[in-house]
């Protein structure tokens, strides 16, 4: 269902990268379920500002995919959306904190039949972090999955 890919790092900043391309590759041949959840390695107990974007294709939705999740982890255990943007093919449906305290993003599409996308991460230089995706699941959960 999903494969990890080697990321391409762009411009280091202290303990992380400003941008990381191809942090995760997701693809599916199944049209349903319609939600996909991604769990990051970013703890909600640290104050971080970052954006994750999805770029790809959605054959079942007859559209290119372009979506983005702006995320702020509060440092107090919370994860707050700071701009969810959907251009086409996949809805940036939400952000949340996992049960074990990590930032997660949720995507939705009316159909995921032959859909695939890469995730890229962009971090504010003052809040650098080496972002990775630690888990992904295609399911029917519209709320918090992790």
Where are these regions (language model features)?
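Trimeric viral appendage architectures of receptor-binding fibers, tailspike depolymerases
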Residues: 1-146
